[in-house]
Regions:
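N-terminal leader/auxiliary helical segments
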Residues: 1-17, 22-206
Length: 206
């Protein structure tokens, strides 16, 4: 309804991106959650949550290399989240309407803009061009859950762990064998279906 009432390319592109994110999460999270539990059992000081962060950070590096041929050291994360006040205010307006419509929460647009600015700052802080930040926090958090280190994208992933399941090893209940890249491809199909029916279709059937 919001997009019908606000035919603006900023709103549309943001929502399209959100749908793509949702599609990948819903498709890949069963595998990621399973692997996170497995790694947490192997490292008693960690939690499934921190291992989830480590897996997604490793996959960020893997997908970046796959899609662009670049290493994380060549990318400033905050550039993935550029500051643009006009765009931020439109996104804040979108979220304000959604939060009120779905939950009855009257959140100010200023608070939502501040949340985006905070996120931009976090992206800047976890950009690690040399690998030294990750090593520092790994040392600080040694023997404890890696709440910070696990969210810093590594220059290259730990080659002792097949994060993307390239070997198609069984996972979950043992009947699943898809690699992350196969799930990635499935997610593109899910996103295409949602977006193809977004304004008119019954998304509850997806």
């Amino acid at each position: 309804e919001f997009l019908k009432q606000h035919p603006d390319s900023v709103y549309r592109s943001y929502v399209w991106g959100f749908v793509c994110h949702y599609s990948l999460d819903s498709t890949a999270h069963p595998y990621i959650n399973w692997l996170a539990e497995k790694l947490a059992k192997q490292r008693p000081w960690e939690t499934a949550s921190t291992m989830h962060g480590e897996i997604e950070s490793a996959l960020d590096a893997i997908v970046l290399r796959y899609e662009t041929g670049k290493l994380p050291s060549e990318v400033a994360l905050k550039a993935m989240f550029p500051k643009n006040e006009a765009v931020e205010r439109k996104i804040a307006h979108l979220y304000r309407q959604i939060l009120f419509s779905l939950y009855g929460d009257d959140v100010s647009e200023e608070s939502l803009v501040q949340a985006m600015n905070d996120a931009h700052g976090v992206f800047s802080l976890v950009t690690d061009r040399t690998g030294l930040k990750k090593k520092l926090f790994e040392r600080i958090e040694r023997g404890k859950p890696s709440a910070i280190a696990s969210h810093i994208v590594p220059l290259t992933e730990n080659d002792q762990i097949d994060y993307a399941n390239i070997q198609n090893a069984p996972w979950g209940d043992g009947d699943s064998h898809q690699s992350f890249f196969e799930l990635y491809g499935e997610a593109q199909g899910v996103a295409g279906k949602i977006l193809g029916e977004f304004l008119e279709g019954d998304l509850a059937l997806l």
